[in-house]
Amino acid sequence: MIFKHLTLFSLVSVMLLGCTCNTNLSEITVACDEAGSQIDLMVDGNLFTSFRYTTDYEKPFLYPIYSPDGQMITRGFPIDPRPGERTDHPHHIGMWFNHGNVNGLDFWNNSSAIQDKTNYGHIVVTKILEAKGGKRAHLKVLSEWRDQAEVVLLEETTDYYITATLDSRTIDRVSTLKAIQDVIITDNKEGLIAVRVDKAFEKPSNETQVFTDEHGNTTVVEVQDSSGANGMYYGSSGKTGDDIWGTRNDWVMLSAEKDGNVISFGFFDHPSNVGYPFHSHARGYGLFACNNLGAKVFNPVEEEILVTLAKGESLTLKHRFYLETGSKVPAERADSIFTAFSGKY
């Protein structure tokens, strides 16, 4: 197994995680609907999120995602479109994990909007290995990354560890990608862990934006009514707003007010990950992504990321998603969340 552009990290100390003033863990219940290819995660009887793995879509994902006070933080389109929200990028669904170039196949941009899927891959869940509730719920999922002939490139084993308090939610995602054949993952901006957010978390904008993927396909993000949009990105680099795109961070958070309450959430990298610290691929129109498998594509002076896995070799990637209601999580506390996560797994 060959990694280019690796950063070593020596963990000197691990701080205790003081996420909220209420640290008592809530009970999480798990409801499995095998026929509907869906697993619901309930906190004190209220839906937090659902793991959806129907083959109607090109990948599994978590959708919807609710804050502890019951506000939806994910965009509804393309599953449940809501009035006034954007309808661009139909491959942005809930929270997901994939990449734009694996053996030349694009897993990121694949959706029902793509007619010729020759150069695209898809992810299929083959087995739910565990679905357990409790104070620390656990989902263990086996998936396959396939080409259009259903030939398997990667076998993915993913552990989701979910905890909740009165005013916070945490998802730790540990994913091991095992090469079923020789695999090359190349430097690409389209990745890696992402969530498409509700309108409240977008940046207000009065400009039409045009984005082009590596296939030359363009997506126009039209100007829309920005009323209610007040999202602000911030990260460990000190960058905020649009300036955070393409920068390296230990963590990136997004905060906004929705229906009178402040909600903050974000992604945390792990020092053991290839490409640590990850690059922010966060856009003001509502894509919130962080990418360990892109470097030069974000910053031309950086060395290109190249991950080569011989058949049977594997790559493990670890990320935390943290969500809190009631305040904008300050940078100092985000640092402590990152440090605590760094000492796990």
Where on the chain are the PLM-derived regions?
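Acidic (Asp/Glu-rich), glycine- and aromatic
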Residues: T54-Y57, F61-P64, T165-E214, E222-V223
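Beta-strand-rich recognition/accessory modules
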Residues: F265-Y345
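C-terminal motif of bacterial Sec signal peptides marking the signal peptidase cleavage site
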Residues: L17-G18
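Extended, loop-rich substrate-binding clefts of extracytoplasmic carbohydrate-active enzymes
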Residues: H89-D167
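Beta-strand elements of well-folded, non-transmembrane domains
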Residues: S143-D147, Y160-A164, L177-Q181, V197-F201, ...
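Active-site/ligand-binding surface loops and adjacent short beta/alpha elements
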Residues: K189-G275
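Bacterial N-terminal signal peptides that target proteins for export
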Residues: M1-T7
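Beta-strand-rich N-terminal accessory domains
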Residues: T23-P90, N188, G326-K328, A334-D335
